[in-house]
From Swiss-Prot:
Family of this protein: Belongs to the peptidase A8 family.
PANTHER family xrefs: LIPOPROTEIN SIGNAL PEPTIDASE
Pfam families for this protein: Peptidase_A8 (PF01252)
Stored HAMAP family: LspA (MF_00161)
Protein task: This protein specifically catalyzes the removal of signal peptides from prolipoproteins.
GO CC field: plasma membrane
Name by which UniProt lists this protein: Lipoprotein signal peptidase
Domain of life: Bacteria
Localization per Swiss-Prot or TrEMBL: Cell membrane
Amino acid sequence: MTDETSGPAEPVTDAPGDAESPAQPKRRLRLLLTVAAVVLFLDVVTKVLAVRLLTPGQPVSIIGDTVTWTLVRNSGAAFSMATGYTWVLTLVATGVVIGIIWMGRRLVSPWWALGLGLILGGATGNLVDRFFRSPGPLRGHVVDFFSVGWWPVFNVADPSVVGGAILLVALSLFGFDFDTVGRRRPGEDAEPSAGASDSTPEAPAADGPDKPAGPVGPEDAAEESKTVGHQAEPS
């Protein structure tokens, strides 16, 4: 006999969050590449203008002698560090760019996409100089043009890389992972260990051989009295 009150089965549909989750890495990758493209564009344009308008060794004052336009050719890393290792820095920067692009395909956090985009744009901007400026490929000198006080001369790419790295460190410290949208829950890492401890079987108590439960008969009582008597005898 069939139940006439039951209606037709409703089709099972995915939740809106499940339908959007596969598209999130693609959107984050687009955000990453957009930020990187903006940084790269600003870096390349400002370097071209600096080379055309500035003369090496002749700073142009912006705020006295504290902030100036100063054209410098840098063979080292950001802020004129590690000079003399140009080809090593070029290979390292190339590896960083490849790693960020590979990681960008799995990004879910928009903040991680922003930080990685800043690093990618800055690293790519300096790589353009490494490959296409004198004295040659892998050995090209980066164009720096902005000087602030005692700080080394830098360009747009340098603070972009440093700012992106600081952002990623802050996100990691505050519990924002690259593969999640929000913060990581504080007890999320402790749950597996707690579950494992609960499932550990308890060891049986070693109290000697088990005796059958039930009423004590005359023979058992006599045996117990003999045992007590032997224990009470002086040694």
